[in-house]
Amino acid sequence: MDSGDATSLLLTKIRSLEPDYAPKIIGYLLLHDFGDRDLMHLARGPESILQSTISKVKSLLGIFSNNSPSSTPTSPSPLNPICRPPLNGRGSSHSNGFMDFRRNSPSSPSSTSPWSFNNCINGNNGNNPHISPKHTPISKPFSSHQSNGLSATHSGSADAAGGADLLDDQQLNDCLSFLDDSCSKTEDLVDPSIPLDYSVDGDGETHLHRRSFSCDASFVSGDDGFGGGCKPCVYFSRGLCKNGESCKFIHGGYPDNMDGNGIVADSPRKMENFVRQHEEMMRLKLAYQQQRLASQILGRAPQLPYEKRMDFLLQQHAQRDGGLPFGDERFWSSSPGRLERMELAMHLGDQSNSASRQIYLTFPADSTFKDEDVATYFSLFGTVQDVRIPYQQKRMFGFVSFAHPETVKVVLARGNPHFICDSRVLVKPYKEKGKVLDKKQQQLLQQQIERGNYSPCSSPSGIDPREQSDFHLGSKMLYERREMMRRKIEQADLLRAIELERRRFINLQLPEFKNSVTLNHHRSFSVGSPGYFSSAGNQSPDFQSELNGADALKVTDDTLELHPYPVVNPMSVNNSYSNGAKEETNKSELLDPDSGSTIELVLPSNLFPSASSTDDHKTDDSAETNAKVGVSSTNENDHEPPVTTNNLMQ
């Protein structure tokens, strides 16, 4: 309820009772912080309560009625708004919200008795012997509030001249019981001589500070950790308070951490998360614009199913931002560079989108139709948004913008010519200058669309050197669930095929070919099958003589068991040696254990020639043969037959 209504209503009622002193009485009540609820109770309560209160205030102010003779006070009343009563013992009179005054009576000029507004409500007085001593002036609050008001002293005996008491304490307790609906009967927990609203400064003086009877003193004083003020800070709820910790309002927010508009106000971290979500939505919107631009350039379908969902998502986001009390651009004041780039890219995207909704007109210079005529004609195909024809004497071109790109396709499919006001009009598709990409850029853009790599920057290459550290929007955010699953399956199949190919190369074994001199000759050099040589053939002649027959036979047999390759026929070797011992290369036959057929093998005449004999006997053919074959042979100078199993056994 408005405080002005309660005050004016109470003032009107007091004027009806005390027309001369009504301003003083209402001013006294307002100076001592009577709450709106208290004033309204007095204004709408019984008239006896108001008369008792008026009499009490008049006694405090030292105002007496003309029909009631009163004794002249020996000393003026020390009622002063700036008076500060000293904080002494219990014998001294102290006030909780009101100034002390002393009223001298003829019978006892110096006798005083402390009383408070609490005593009036509780029905006790300083000189009343029937009141329990454990109840003190500050022990009973008003409706769970600590009562700190209207304390004064008055005479303990009746006024001799008046013939009656000014106010009966018990009667005042009954009359003002509405102020003590939920009065507690607890014992004192603090020193009764120290009022709750007293504050002591460095000089030991007390200060009176009380806001209202209807306001909780503990909440006002900041005992709950807010530091002052019962109202939340509006600037903090919007994200920033320039006063910081020194702000007199609460930086805590409403219940459930929400303010009146539903915005999180007490958690800067949550506000940062909200800003981050907003930034991600801006990136998503920018990527969507670039995707639509690429689709229009390459002549793809105008709208896919996920694009409709993106339109709905962006529309919901725009509606949510429009409902904010501080607008959409407030978050981006700290990052103008990024915001400008995004706005520029979106503006370019909007322009490109508008290009698909426009057509180019050519007509004779002597045409007389107006913009309205063009709009009326093309409205037959669809909604016309704008018509632009230059204001020239000889005009020959113009532009028409439609609300939907599909209308442009319908107009172009209609063909030429069109007749507007008997003028021949030709329609052509609208193309922006400087927007045509070269073939390389179109291929790159097509690859990005197929792979789903959409960059948030506005460059066609997808590279922004000024913002390389920013993350790019993932491709899977723009695809449906089935498309994502298909891509995952394809990726898994590709990885599986790569793994199988890698294992095949590691364990590569070439198949055996029969009756092929060349393949059997190069078998030992294939991948995965190293070449094996006979132990007896690699030994020197001196070491061979030291071996006895049994040892040599054992070595040869072990070699044959480990490596079942075609074995050299000893008889063929001896025959070849006897027939062509002087030749540089000897030809011997290989015996294939499986088929029993013989394979002709070219053997070098000398594997380790001397330095002098190399120049004389080494030719191009022998050098090529020595590089391909690694089988041991006999020395050329001695012309000894090669060591075989038959020779060792002899």
UniProtKB/Swiss-Prot annotation:
Compositionally skewed regions (Polar residues) per UniProt: 141-154
InterPro entries for the chain: AtC3H46-like_PABC-like, AtC3H46-like_RRM, Nucleotide-bd_a/b_plait_sf, RBD_domain_sf, RRM_dom, Znf_CCCH
Biased composition (Low complexity): 105-128
Zinc finger intervals, C3H1-type: 232-254
Region (Disordered): 67-162, 566-650
PROSITE patterns: RRM (PS50102), ZF_C3H1 (PS50103)
Pfam families: PABC_AtC3H46 (PF23182), RRM_1 (PF00076), zf-CCCH (PF00642)
Residue stretches making up the RRM domain: 357-433
Keyword entries, A-Z: DNA-binding, Metal-binding, RNA-binding, Zinc, Zinc-finger
Keyword field contains Metal-binding: yes
Organism: Arabidopsis thaliana (Mouse-ear cress)
Record's compositionally biased regions (Basic and acidic residues): 581-590
GO MF annotations, alphabetized: DNA binding; RNA binding; zinc ion binding
Name used for this protein in its record: Zinc finger CCCH domain-containing protein 55
